């Protein structure tokens, strides 16, 4: 990739899985059809929100806690380190340990598809396990079916 403008825009989540580094096991924490939006603004801010495809309506405190546990939401200022590294300086997040951190990802853009691969990290979704997240996004307005 040589043109940073290729990543600018609004992207919809098409697929998401976590791979446990130690075992190679793959987990789809949000199921086969996760929901998410990844907004990359030309002014240097990114906003990410992801949820499972199927959620119960939050009726009880337990339901609400479960929904929150499966949420991913953060924002911050980003920079692109060519050829393929995207770094977000997180300034607000659902998961307090991410605030003040830099979240680095590798990326590739092929047409209207953006693939993001995280560096090994820990997430509330998998406890203490070190995982690599793999996300496939499609540019909003081009998603079919």
Kindly give the residue locations of the regions a language model identified.
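Lipid interaction determinants
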Residues: 1-73, 77-145
């Amino acid at each position: 990739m040589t043109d940073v403008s290729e990543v600018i825009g609004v992207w919809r989540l098409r697929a998401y899985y976590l791979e446990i580094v130690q075992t190679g096991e793959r987990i789809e924490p949000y199921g086969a059809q996760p929901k998410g939006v990844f907004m990359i603004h030309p002014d240097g801010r990114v906003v990410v929100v992801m949820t499972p495809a199927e959620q119960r309506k939050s009726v009880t405190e337990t339901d609400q806690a479960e929904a929150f546990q499966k949420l991913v939401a953060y924002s911050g200022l980003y920079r692109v380190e060519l050829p393929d590294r995207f770094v977000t300086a997180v300034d607000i997040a659902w998961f307090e340990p991410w605030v003040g951190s830099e979240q680095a990802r590798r990326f590739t853009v092929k047409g209207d598809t953006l693939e993001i691969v995280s560096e090994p990290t820990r997430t509330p979704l998998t406890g203490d396990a070190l995982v690599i997240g793999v996300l496939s996004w499609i540019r909003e307005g081009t998603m079919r079916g």
